[in-house]
Amino acid sequence: MNPRVCFVAPFGLGQKTTVWARTLPLARVLATHGWRPTLLIPPWDTPQDDDRRWKDGDVELINIALRGGLLVQLKRLLYEVNSIQPDIIHIVKPRAHAGLVQWWLWRTPRHQRPPILLDADDWEQAWAPINRYPWPLARFLAWQEEWGIRHADGVTVASRWLAETIGRANPTAPLLWLPNGVEPPAPDAPRWRAHAGKDVLFFTRFVEVSPQWLAQFASSLYEKSPGSTLLIAGAPVREGLDRPFRRLLQEAAHPASARIEWLGFVDRTQLAALYNRIGCAIFPAEPTILQQAKCSVRLANTLLAGVPVVASAVGEQAAYGADGAARLVPVQATPEEFAATVAEVLATPAQQRALGETARQRLLKRYDWRMLGAQLHAFYRRILGN
């Protein structure tokens, strides 16, 4: 009988990216290696999926019913885990529902339960001040994260910062660095074309840099490339988080404020038109824990589309952009220095073409989900062998 793995998620398949952009692609690849994967989901953020089940190829997705409150939901999750009888339980983020399942199952002696693995793709505590969690909730989530890291039979991590941090907290647990990957693009997938335009695209959740940094960058970009418009795409992770950015950029008594467009959330259907306008995309990031710990799906997909990228060499951005896949800017670069690099790329079509082609080739060679999923399959075999 083929082995079973049960992924226990903390949320559903909505705007939060982890489950649909990381867990599901890995599960699909595991199925090609003979595993029978199940994704167990508490769909509190996607209530339209309440109590729904379906198959995604050979991957089973189970959304529990939400009625009855947290304790009843936890009971349903544990019931489904027991019904599945998995050979491996893989907790997706050590928080909320998934963290509670991990805590409960860990109470069972190791020889009476399957291995419990943890997948970490973020440092959850770094989000508490951004989301303005009440102190009791912030402290509980911090405890969940710290406890979950220390109580796992194995850990998969999306960034090297997480590997180092979790490796120190749980040095005896086997650990696998497993960054976010990409799938080979469809023939009709949005793709950047040379000589597309002179505008600059900034995908943001308004947490990467400060409003002051962005205002200084916009002013400097206007001076160095006055024909370029800064396109700011993305929705804030918390309502109102974009207001300081808008206020500072709009109030600045500088012509640069007229060369900024606020696009809001951009979905996949809008990307082709955007790519036709831009000469490059930017991924600035300050060297905070939040930025060092994460592994940007958006950056990976932008590089895969052949878009010339200028990025801060912070965390996994430095890994994605290595070997000429992106124009990497030193961590301590000023906004003016970052803008100078962007202006140079915009003024050099040959560099744009080289960046785009190198990025596309490198992402497919080093970050294909099929390769990463095969590594996870081997990691599972190692865990079961122990």
Residue ranges and their predicted role:
Residues E344, Q351-R366:
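A short, well-ordered alpha-helix in the C-terminal region of glycosyltransferases
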